[in-house]
Amino acid sequence: MEIEASRQQTTVPVSVGGGNFPVGGLSPLSEAIWREKAPTEFVGDVSARLTWQDLTVMVTMGDGETQNVLEGLTGYAEPGSLTALMGPSGSGKSTMLDALASRLAANAFLSGTVLLNGRKTKLSFGTAAYVTQDDNLIGTLTVRETIWYSARVRLPDKMLRSEKRALVERTIIEMGLQDCADTVIGNWHLRGISGGEKRRVSIALEILMRPRLLFLDEPTSGLDSASAFFVTQTLRALSRDGRTVIASIHQPSSEVFELFDRLYLLSGGKTVYFGQASDAYEFFAQAGFPCPALRNPSDHFLRCINSDFDKVRATLKGSMKLRFEASDDPLEKITTAEAIRLLVDYYHTSDYYYTAKAKVEEISQFKGTILDSGGSQASFLLQTYTLTKRSFINMSRDFGYYWLRLLIYILVTVCIGTIYLNVGTSYSAILARGSCASFVFGFVTFMSIGGFPSFVEDMKVFQRERLNGHYGVAAFVIANTLSATPFLIMITFISGTICYFMVGLHPGFTHYLFFVLCLYASVTVVESLMMAIASIVPNFLMGIIIGAGIQGIFMLVSGFFRLPNDIPKPFWRYPMSYISFHFWALQGQYQNDLRGLTFDSQGSAFKIPGEYVLENVFQIDLHRSKWINLSVILSMIIIYRIIFFIMIKTNEDVTPWVRGYIARRRMKQKNGTQNTTVAPDGLTQSPSLRNYIATRTDGARRW
């Protein structure tokens, strides 16, 4: 675990992004992680120079047809610069960003050359970071807590706790989040920070380890003009600290556009312009499409290369809703498709293209040091402990995670208790006890699917952190299990106690203990099942439907609605009833409740032994102990959690490989070639997520 500071830390000013901030005295380890990554000179092993030449990305369709999403792109990104990728929707901005960051889909193939510091190398964790468009954050944590827990799962164990705190505060100041540092992120019932602040928190999480190369997918999407300007200004400040920043931008304002150092303009996957952002005005004017006065330059550039405007004009013209007036605008005289062709052709014959090409050649000749931060250095135990604590805090603060379910469980069990109040040992109590157990272990446990939306949110956070190599799958699965256990114990013991004593089930502490343990195990099995579903179903509505369907089938073969010996043997009896936890729960609870009791007979003075009821009414095997039934349910918890782990690993490793293999097969069959196991010459298939993460976490634990 972390080493506590045993001495008084001395406050020293540290220069970050042009400013001095007080940070606690740092050990040599901290210096190695931080000072060397925040230089004032963009040279040596502290810089990232990225070049791409003749970059082409081809995707395969379902019928084997291929389509070039990107075609012949050439450009570069240097330390200290903010490069913006712009273009209309569908122009290839996100694909280009994914290609440069090694995140292409399995059915996408890349050709051309992408070099980092003059070398073909994978982007390792700590060297490059990727900020997605969606801000998948834990809404119940404060900004400071969010960054703090992220630091703990990545920074080395041997680093002092006070140093980690200082680095977190430094990052908060760097991103301008100090005013909202103690405000919760916000969720469905907690009002939190603004959208722009959430975006800056997402960026702060990825710059915590001081990556040299930062990719951002539409960081200003969905933000108002002020928030978009603040976020972009922050990115510009980060680039001035020696980082190489590349961001895709959809529709920037004029103020935001002025913050860009370089502009890469795309249309239909082709380069329209690449160069200094300030030179784009002159380029469009030289190409015959000058920017009118009082018009936002970025709006004008996108207007020239967005063919959707032709469709709008045609629609309005057909409906007689567009008034045409004489204009000197060249776009009024030609179609947008023709304008795009003219701009693309002009760029490839202009000085801008040859200057960029020469610069790419120059940078490619410089063989810089291979950038590798060594991966996440936190131990597996520290990662698991931190994730468990973070998840526990989230569950305790989110009213809808477990607290609301606790209230519903109490309400339902009180209803059960009043309906079956003091059920007794009369003849009618035999079926009453059986139906009560069936409802408790069938429909009461069924309510656990209500937590599925929260599971989906957890998976979104995990996927974001996993893609950037924060921690492994095993740490997440174990932490999720441990953090939920206290809440599940609390829910089942409180509701189980109410039900047990109100109904008047078999008296005795061991009988009571078995009942609540069996209820806990059953609820936990449902939770584990829903977590496995959440790992493969991204939509919470679909997940609830699938989970409800599976549990409905399990209840049918539980042995109550249809007695065990009457269930059709093929499939339904074997194996369905044996993989249903309802079956084992009812088998155990029937024995727990009825064995040792005697019931009144109908029209006779003789008493009916509970053992007779078990064998002849409920068809229970008395040779199998009730504790064996409980142990089977407990083993199902482990099995479902293992399935949860396997499903995540399958989505990371197997699914991308299968999709890539199928894509290559279809492409080869379409082309009539013989080789069906390799990509075409010059094409490199995008790596699977496992390979991607493995290269980003080289030296760190992958599990």
UniProtKB/Swiss-Prot annotation:
Tissue spec. comment: Expressed in seedlings, roots, stems, leaves, flowers, and siliques, mostly in epidermis, trichomes, vasculatures and developing tissues. Follows an uniparental maternal expression in the seed, thus being the product of a maternally expressed imprinted gene. Accumulates in the phloem. Transcripts seem to be transported from shoots to roots.
Subcellular location: Cell membrane
Gene Ontology BP term (one): fatty acid transport
The entry's keywords: ATP-binding, Cell membrane, Glycoprotein, Membrane, Nucleotide-binding, Phosphoprotein, Transmembrane, Transmembrane helix, Transport
Reported phenotype of the disruption mutant: Bushy phenotype. Abnormal cuticle and pollen grain shapes, reduced levels of wax and cutin monomers, unusual lipidic cytoplasmic inclusions in epidermal cells, inter-organ postgenital fusions, and altered morphology of trichomes and pavement cells. Altered petal and silique morphology, fusion of seeds, and changes in levels of cutin monomers in flowers and siliques associated with the suppression of the expression of a large number of cuticle-associated genes. Altered root suberin composition, as well as root expression of suberin biosynthetic genes.
Positions annotated with a glycan in the UniProt record: N394, N671, N675
Complex formation: Homodimer. Forms heterodimers with ABCG9, ABCG12 and ABCG14 in epidermal cells.
Name of the featured protein: ABC transporter G family member 11
